[in-house]
From Swiss-Prot:
Gene name in the database record: Pcsk5
Classification of source organism: Eukaryota, Metazoa, Chordata, Craniata, Vertebrata
Segments forming domain Peptidase S8: 136-455
Record family assignment: Belongs to the peptidase S8 family.
Boundaries of every P/Homo B domain copy: 463-603
Stretches that traverse the bilayer: 1701-1721
Swiss-Prot/TrEMBL domain comment: The propeptide domain acts as an intramolecular chaperone assisting the folding of the zymogen within the endoplasmic reticulum. AC 1 and AC 2 (clusters of acidic amino acids) contain sorting information. AC 1 directs TGN localization and interacts with the TGN sorting protein PACS-1.
Protein name per Swiss-Prot or TrEMBL: Proprotein convertase subtilisin/kexin type 5
Cleavage (site feature) positions: 116-117
Signal peptide segment: 1-34
Broad EC category: hydrolase
Residue span of region AC 1: 1757-1776
Length: 1809
């Protein structure tokens, strides 16, 4: 690198020290990235140019002029300020900022800007010496001479007459060589200037390295002159080209602003191929002036149409840079262009980001072709590269489009690019189709630009609607970004729908403003997901970005949501992936973020905008499904997605038929696609159908057919649905985006092993749920087991598992002992109610209590003195007395001791701790230190730091430490060691277990074998093996010589049953099976005839007996086959000319080469003689041949006498009664390949005879065992015992509780801790409050705690409009309070309005004229105090009924004092009053309806409540006057029996005729889901779905099913007799009109005057005098005239007669209503029925039965409608006329019309009137 100023500094004559300092500064400055200030200022001055001149002159500045097109912004220069300085300028000139007219001033800072080509020295480059037009490969893709697969169709635009004429493009760079022969003709001086040199000449500075070639190269791509025989051709070769020289000097904000705003009314397009450093660590963008210049340009440039800014996306690919950190390409005002190589692959330098709009060609690897263009010194180059080459190419294409339509706005240009760019052959793994149908990628934006398509679109373009900008509210909720995790924030955007000037409905750009603090910015990745599910990567990890600055209000931008709807949930995700370079542990924080939505409020593409794309010169489809191609312009091939049937035009919507799939748009356009886009699934008829709204992928359109979910939703794998909140028993697995199941016993959890709440009957032990066992038991993992006999409570088996001890035992160091050991004392302070033994002080041998002052005896050599052990007088500390009485030194580890060894210590030095007589430096791992002593850890811990199970620091073998709770939890079964992160990932296995892929197995899994306690994988395609050989192969492969092959060797065939290669018959060369007639080729000399190898003369010798006398050998068939085959080949060849040949030596007689009989001792098998029958055959003595065993049999002793079945993993067969079956029949189970009998009472079983799967008869299944009844808290559902719901005491269904456990309450069939709002608890049930109450103590209107209507007030439980007299309203709680006793009317507790007699109002208080004693009252007549009656304590007059209060032992009843309250009152001992009972109570214990002790006549008592009608689940017992419980199967009932039900609970159905509730309706009935009843099928139906005649699913005898109707097989009055086709018809019983069989109990229809009794199919008369009710052989026609209902029994009749008059009246009213209904019905019959658009179906072949009911008397229309998302609705409307003729109305046309589903759409739902 040439440092320039450094070399100038060190010229001869300079001081050496100065040179050194200058060079040092030059080296350090780039490293430190210090700001470099210039002597140029940008100033905003109001008042015009003259005022700016005046102020500049006043402070020593030179006013260079206005900054570009920025009004009131001026460029000031100060010659006396250092040209470059690391310090901002100070001096008198800085006082300019105090001038009133100076609104803003900024000293300019040098900005690092990099040209976006790449250094050719990095890669070997290829030079071409003759750069001519034919070599410009990127313009010739369509001529088949270049390998590029997709054309930018530039020639197509030229052929339409567009070459860029009158369009002005300027290149913002290091200047352009305006004198270049290829540029001078198109050079435009008005579009050119030199910002660096402050003049108008853009000529570059020349030097030896040609450093400033960049701008000239870019200019040639755009507008190099055509046909001048010099060098190359520009894309817009008639456009005007200019240049702004601005990169060859200090680049400041002012320099950039001047450049991008230069002559904006003349320049149309600005092209820039530079930006901040692409080093993977810079975050930089335009400063304030440049941002202002961009905004002014799009607002006012091109006379209000807006300047077009084209920008190269960046070359930081090698540095893992991300162009989202470049504020120029990240701007909505710039068109960011990326590059692709000739092959369509990603170039190595390419950055990816969500702001890239489109792509053009450039170079790729060093060996790839590069771009040909103009170069400095009037030369050409074929080495132009990088995204620098792509941006000018795009500028040239845009120039062609602007020539086609000069009125395109800056936004129109972007829309045209979006709609015409295409993916083509561009290679990226992130292509996706957004919800608007646009295909988009982070590498290439919307794809390769298409010049011809753009000019065609521009020709007919209509300006898009006005841009709206919606700034959504900022989310300032601070969220911590933890390492290796993600932060997710969801914002519900409205698109500013409440503000019409800012409402954004259809999106263009989306900007996300983010503030994040973070210790290493490069570790962050940020994603944004739109409401439609499109996910944009706003930022990727950057390896070299070590900055700790984070992002402060940085704007990320995405175009991936273009065309989508704005409103909905936007999901921001921030991921932190810590790199190894990160040293700081402080987590990052998402401080705030907000959305800025740009777009339109209305659809931007009106019908006039739906212009055709051109395909004339390209051969790959334009991937924009929203376009409408014009057939009149079509002249090319069909779209690749059309099938060979053909097309009507070039587009994917012109196909006659699709090759792969299609989907429809709301404009009825069908688009052909290679695969269904995200959010769709492959349906029938090649149709792509929409998934449910929350599904990302699916297998059907319903909400329960999802395969994966959109962001913000999680897949519930059990229901295949996407949910925002995972259901109970599962947790949100953010990594997999699914609802992960909690472990078996968890109710709620945060991970599989982290329970937060347990199911009923279990308790949380750390993070695991265990069964709550009774005291004296522990949970073993399966059930509760008894503790050791010493333990009162325990955590595990054995004496070591005790927590507390039984009576007579005490706890000592984790064990239960009968008495304390030596050196322990009994601690009487109870811990949890239990005593324990504590260790004595070290100095004591025995003791009575804690500390050194409670010793009771001392070690040898110590004397007991006042409870303390003192050293004997003769020895010192550190010594002990030996047996001779001499002092000896203790072991060095002891401070005091009683013996010589290290185990004899009694106290320790300060550096050691005491451990069972030893002084150690540290406690062993299984103990912890407390008060300088070692204590044992909890028995579950291997190491610990405290006594409890949660203080473990290390765990035993086979356990791991739970990171959240610190407890030791068991590893996966078989693991000796496992990791905390994954307890299933074993580090070693227990004895008897095999290790395979970090898991321990008792037996090695499939396709592995065990070797040295490891499972090793079998060979390729092997299904089972050992270390020596493979035993069988995967499906499609055959075992051959120990390995698995797809094709067997010649002479062998693949046996599908055995999975092995077996030898062919010896007569075959190759074959397809074992038989002689399964040859596929023959040995030489024989010919193939229908699978058999025969002599050519076979017809002449067939049947001849050959050479019977030849002696027989005893060959081995399998062994001899290869040798025999070789012998035969020689023999056949040798004797081919002979007419007759001898049989094979093994045959007795033969036909050709095939034996037909065998000598004695051998047997015929497959036309060969064998010494014994092979496996799979049996010897037939009758035929002396081997017969094949039955199919699937491996060995047998005869036909149907199988002894062993074939068995393969994919096809296991089981032996049962001499035959082989795929599964055992009912009552048998598989054991060792044989079906064995299940043990009674098992109906079916599995695994062993007693492991039942279903039970016989009335037995029920519970955990694999059949019982007569289910255990407590279980219920039988379809023969299986199901556990009642949680907290349930008794239930009738696994989801329907009938009685709760204590302290729980029944609500909606489940048990709850408390009742919901507006319910009160009573008898373990939640009972609804009265409608007036908001909360209550009972069901009545005077049981309220608060009022539902806020305008009401509460008084004594009643909600009233106003407080009654003698009370006032308490405004705090809206209750009525009693006035003071002297007040008659008051407005508050302190304000009386009127007083009782004898009192007057004085200052709002009622006072007596004179203060009387407590037992006196003021007598108005005598004007003095008089005594109260003796029964009163206080009073208002002399009589006994004028009391206010009463003496003790008496109670105030109204105004009288009584000793006992009468019936209907209860005694309130606090107020000494008799308070009325509730109106429903006869006697009570309180005022509420729930405090009754007995009830009034006519009321029923339920607990302490009196009811006129018993609540659900109870019936009124009139004898006792109580509500008694119904049978638990009933919801309501009339008695205690299961046959007294009147309605049923959920999941049950009422059979009214029997009064029973059934889980499933009996035969001949169907379940009416709405009424929850079992209703009788039509008499002809055996099974049905409804009561109508056409709802049959199957028929009774003598009828057959025809379109849901059971049609008789005989004429009316006869029934079928006999099976098969030859049957007779016999007459029905005389009482039947139609029947299903003989006798009077098989009627299906009745003659006139008779009614059908459904239950026994009899036809009976109505009951009358001759048929009294008692006969049971007549119908109660008063109840029904449609069917026969038998009269009630005498007892029932008597019971009915006791009913109240209310029921009689109700019945009369019902009859009147029925009569009125009949009249209305009769009238309706006379009205005409509209029959438009109905077609009559074919005449039925048989007549309907004479059974008719009212539902057939009217025309019926039945409409089926599928309300789910987008399903085909092809059901027709069925219509039945009065004559029984069936019609069908078709929803989509006439009966004979072809299927047409044109009314179906995938993007919206429509309803039709």
């Amino acid at each position: 690198m040439d440092w320039g100023w450094g070399s100038r500094c060190c010229r001869p004559g300079r001081r050496d020290l100065l040179c050194v300092l200058a060079l040092l500064a030059g080296c350090l400055l780039p490293v430190c990235r210090t700001r470099v200030y210039t002597n140029h200022w940008a100033v905003k001055i109001a008042g015009g140019f003259a005022e700016a001149d005046r102020i500049a002159s006043k402070y020593g500045f030179i006013n260079v002029g206005q900054i570009g097109a920025l009004k009131d912004y001026y460029h000031f220069y100060h010659s006396r300020t250092i040209k470059r300085s690391v310090l901002s300028s100070r001096g008198t000139h800085s006082f300019i900022s105090m001038e009133p007219k100076v609104e803003w001033i900024q000293q300019q800072v040098v900005k690092k800007r990099t040209k976006r080509d790449y250094d050719l020295s990095r890669a070997q480059s290829t030079y071409f010496n003759d750069p001519k037009w034919p070599s410009m490969w990127y313009m010739h893709c369509s001529d088949n001479t270049h390998p590029c697969q997709s054309d930018m169709n530039i020639e197509g635009a030229w052929k339409r007459g567009y070459t860029g004429k009158n369009i002005v493009v300027t290149i913002l760079d290091d200047g352009i060589e305006r004198t270049h022969p290829d540029l001078m003709q198109n050079y435009d001086a008005l579009a050119s200037c030199d910002v660096n040199g402050n003049d108008l000449d853009p000529m570059p500075r020349y030097d030896a390295s040609n450093e400033n070639k960049h701008g000239t190269r870019c200019a040639g791509e755009v507008a190099a002159t055509a046909n001048n025989s010099h060098c190359t051709v520009g894309i817009a070769f008639n456009a005007k080209i200019g240049g702004v020289r601005m990169l060859d000097g200090d680049v400041t904000d002012m320099v950039e602003a001047k450049s991008v705003s230069y002559n904006p009314q003349h320049v149309h397009i600005y092209s820039a191929s530079w930006g901040p450093d692409d080093d993977g660590k810079t975050v930089d963008g335009p400063a304030p002036l440049t941002r202002q210049a961009f905004e002014n340009g799009v607002r006012m440039g091109r006379r209000g149409l807006g300047s077009v800014f084209v920008w190269a996306s960046g070359n930081g690919g090698r540095s893992k840079d991300h162009c989202s950190c470049d504020g120029y390409t990240n701007s909505i005002y710039t068109i960011s262009i990326s590059s692709t190589a000739e092959s369509g692959k990603k170039p190595w330098y390419l950055e990816e980001c969500s702001s890239t709009l489109a792509t053009t060609y450039s170079s790729g690897e060093s060996y790839d072709k590069k771009i040909i263009t103009t170069d400095l010194r009037q030369r050409c180059t074929d080495n132009h590269t990088g995204t620098s080459a792509s941006a000018p190419m795009a500028a040239g294409i845009i120039a062609l489009a602007l020539e086609a339509n000069p009125f395109l706005t800056w936004r129109d240009v972007q829309h045209v690019i979006v709609r015409t760019s295409r993916a083509g052959h561009l290679n990226a793994n992130d292509w996706k189709t957004n919800a608007a149908g646009f295909k988009v990628s982070h590498l290439y934006g919307f794809g390769l630009m298409d010049a011809e398509a753009m000019v065609m679109e521009a020709e007919k373009w209509t300006t898009v609607p006005q841009q709206h900008v919606c700034v959504e509210s900022t989310d300032r909720q601070i969220k911590t970004i933890r390492p290796n995790s993600a932060v997710r924030s969801i914002y519900k955007a409205s698109g500013c729908s409440d503000n019409p000037n800012h409402h954004v409905n259809y999106l263009e750009h989306v900007v996300v403003r983010i503030t994040i603090t973070h210790p290493r910015r490069g570790d962050l990745a940020i994603y944004l997901t739109s409401p439609s599910g499109t996910r944009s990567q706003l930022l990727a990890n950057r390896l070299f970005d070590h900055s700790m600055e984070g992002f402060k209000n940085w704007e990320f931008m995405t175009i991936h949501c273009w065309g989508e709807r704005a409103a909905g949930d936007w999901v921001l995700e921030v991921y932190d992936t810590p790199s190894q370079l990160r040293n700081f542990k402080t987590p990052g924080k998402l401080k705030e973020w907000s959305l800025v939505l740009y777009g339109t409020s209305v659809q931007p593409y009106s019908p006039t905008n739906e212009f055709p794309k051109v395909e004339r010169f390209r051969y790959s489809r334009v991937e924009d499904p929203t376009d409408d191609y014009g057939a009149e312009d079509y002249a090319g091939p069909c779209d690749p997605e059309c099938s060979e049937v053909g097309c009507d035009g070039p587009g994917p919507d012109h196909c006659t038929d699709c090759l792969h799939y299609h989907y429809k748009l709301k404009n009825n356009t069908r688009i052909c696609v290679s695969s269904c886009p995200p959010g769709h699934f492959h349906a029938d008829k090649k149709r792509c159908r929409k998934c449910a709204p929350n599904c990302e992928s699916c297998f059907g359109s319903h909400a329960d057919q999802c395969l994966s979910c959109k962001y913000g939703y999680f897949l519930n794998e059990e229901t295949s649905s996407c949910v925002a909140q995972c259901p109970e028993g599962s947790y949100q697995d953010i990594k997999k985006n699914i609802c992960g199941k909690c472990s078996e016993n968890c109710k709620t959890c945060t991970g599989f092993h982290n329970c937060t709440e347990c199911k009923g009957g279990l308790s949380l032990q750390g993070s695991r749920c265990s069964v709550t066992c009774e005291d004296g038991q522990f949970f073993s993992g399966h059930d509760c087991q008894p503790c050791h006999r010493f333990c009162a409570t325990c955590a595990g088996a054995g004496a070591d598992g005790c927590i507390n001890c039984t009576e007579g035992y005490v706890m000592e160091e984790g064990r239960c002992v009968q008495s304390c050991s030596v050196s322990y004392y009994l601690d009487h302070s109870l811990e949890g109610g239990y005593k324990s033994c504590k260790r004595c002080d070290n100095s004591c041998l025995t003791c009575n209590g804690p500390g050194f002052k409670n010793c009771s005896s001392c070690p040898s050599g110590y004397l007991l003195d006042l409870g303390m052990c003192q050293m004997g007088a003769i020895c010192k500390d550190g010594e002990y007395i030996d047996e001779q009485g001499h002092c000896q030194i203790c072991d060095a580890s002891c401070a005091k001791c009683w013996g010589p060894t290290q185990d004899d210590c009694i106290s320790c030095p300060i550096t050691r701790v005491f451990d069972d007589g030893r002084c150690v430096m540290n406690c062993p791992s299984w103990k912890f230190e407390l008060k300088k002593q070692c204590h044992p850890c909890h028995h579950t811990c291997q190491g610990c730091q405290g006594s409890g199970p949660s203080n473990c620091t290390s765990c035993k073998a086979g356990e791991f430490q739970d990171s959240e709770y610190g407890e030791c939890m068991p590893c996966e079964e078989g693991c000796v060691g496992c990791t905390v992160d994954d307890p299933g990932a074993c580090t070693s296995c227990a004895t008897g277990y095999y290790m395979f892929e970090r898991h321990c197995y008792k037996a090695c899994p499939e396709k592995t074998f065990g070797e040295k306690w490891e499972c090793k994988a079998c060979g390729t395609n092997c299904g089972s093996c050992d270390q020596h050989e493979c035993y069988w192969c995967e499906e499609g492969f055959f075992l051959s010589s120990g390995s698995c092959v797809q094709d067997c060797d010649p002479g062998f065939y693949g046996d599908q049953e055995l999975g092995e290669c077996k030898p062919c018959h010896r007569a075959c060369e190759t074959c397809t099976g074992l038989g002689y007639n399964q040859c596929s080729s023959c040995p030489e000399g024989l010919q193939l005839w229908h699978g058999t190898c025969i002599w050519p003369t076979w017809p002449h010798v067939e049947g001849k007996v050959w050479n019977e006398a030849v002696p027989t050998e005893k060959p081995s068939l399998v062994r001899s086959l290869p040798q025999d085959r070789r012998k035969w080949k020689v023999q056949i060849k040798r004797d081919a000319t002979r007419q007759y040949q001898p049989c094979h030596s093994s045959c007795k007689t033969c036909n050709g080469s095939l034996c037909t009989s065998c000598p004695a001792g051998t047997y015929l098998w497959l036309q060969a003689c064998v010494p014994s029958c092979p496996q799979g055959t049996w010897l037939s003595v009758r035929s002396s041949s081997c017969e094949k065993c039955a199919e699937g049999c491996a060995s047998c002793s005869g036909d149907d006498l199988c002894q062993r079945c074939l068995s393969q993993p994919s096809n296991t067969l089981l032996l049962h009664e001499g035959r082989c079956y795929h599964s055992c029949p009912e009552g048998f189970y598989a054991k060792d390949g044989v079906c064995e009998h299940c043990s009674s009472p098992c109906k079916t079983c599995k695994g062993n005879a007693t492991s039942c799967h279903s039970c016989e008869g009335d037995f029920v299944l519970d955990h694999g065992v059949c019982w007569e009844t289910c255990p407590e808290k279980h219920v039988a559902v379809e023969g299986v015992c199901k556990h009642c719901p949680e907290r349930c005491q008794d239930c009738i269904h696994e989801k329907t509780c009938k009685e709760c456990m204590p302290d729980f309450f029944l609500y909606n069939d489940m048990c709850h801790h408390s009742c919901p709002k507006n319910f009160y608890p009573d008898m373990r049930q939640c009972v609804p409050c009265h409608k007036n109450c908001l909360g209550c103590n009972g069901p009545k209107e005077d049981d309220c705690k608060a009022c539902a209507d806020t305008s009401k007030v509460l008084h004594n439980g009643l909600c009233l409009d106003e407080c009654p007299k003698g009370t006032y309203k308490d405004e705090v709680n809206d209750e009525c309070r009693d006035c003071p006793e002297s007040c008659l009317i008051c407005s508050s507790a302190w304000t009386c309005l009127t007083c009782r007699e004898g009192f007057t109002v004085v200052q709002d208080v009622c006072t007596a004229p004179k203060e009387c004693a407590a037992i006196e009252y003021w007598d108005v007549g005598s004007h003095r105090c008089q005594p109260c009656h003796r029964k009163c304590s206080r009073c208002s007059g002399p009589s006994e009924n004028q009391c206010y209060t009463c003496p003790r032992e008496t109670f105030l009843l109204n105004t009288t004092c009584v000793k006992e309250c009468p019936e209907g009152y209860h005694t309130d001992k606090d107020s000494h009053q008799c308070v009325p009972c509730h109106s429903s109570c006869r006697t009570c214990e309180g005022p509420h309806s729930m405090q009754c002790l007995s009830c009034r006549p006519g009321w029923f008592q339920l607990g302490k409540e009196c009811l006129l009608q018993c609540r659900d689940g109870y019936y009124g017992e009139s004898t006792s006057g109580r509500c008694e419980k119904c049978d638990k199967s009933c919801k309501t009932c009339r008695g205690p029996q299961p046959t007294d039900c009147q309605s049923c609970d959920t999941f049950f159905f009422l059979l009214r005729s029997k009064g029973q509730c059934h889980l499933a309706c009996p035969e001949h009935y169907y379940a009416d889901q709405h009424a929850q009843t079992c209703e009788r099928c039509h008499p002809t139906c055996d099974k049905c779905s409804g009561k109508e005649a056409w709802n049959c699913l199957s028929c009774v005898w003598s009828y057959h099913l025809l379109k849901g109707i059971c049609t008789p097989e005989c004429i009316v009055g006869e029934y079928r007799d006999g099976k098969g086709e030859n049957f007779n018809c016999k007459k029905c019983h005389e009482s039947c009109m139609e029947c299903k069989g003989p006798g009077s109990k098989n009627c299906t229809g009745c003659s006139a005057g008779l009614l059908l009794q459904m239950d026994d199919s009899r036809c009976l008369r109505c009951c009358n005098a001759s048929h009294p009710h008692r006969s049971q052989d007549c119908c109660d026609c008063q109840s029904s005239t449609d069917e026969c209902i038998l009269p009630a029994s005498d007892d029932t009749v008597f019971h009915e007669h006791t009913k109240t008059a209310l029921l009689v009246t109700s019945g009369a009213m019902l009859l009147l209503l029925l009569g009125a209904a009949v009249v209305v019905w009769r009238k309706s019959r006379s009205q005409p029925v509209a029959k438009g658009r109905y077609e009559k179906l074919a005449e039925p072949t048989v007549s309907y039965s004479s059974y008719r009911s009212s539902y057939l008397d009217e025309d019926q229309v039945i409409e089926y409608r599928d309300r789910d998302y987008d399903e085909d609705d092809e059901d027709d409307i069925v219509y039945m006329g009065q004559d029984g003729t069936v019609y069908r109305k078709f929803k989509y046309g006439l009966l004979d019309e072809a299927e047409d589903d044109e009314l179906e759409y995938d993007d919206e739902s429509y309803s039709y009137q």
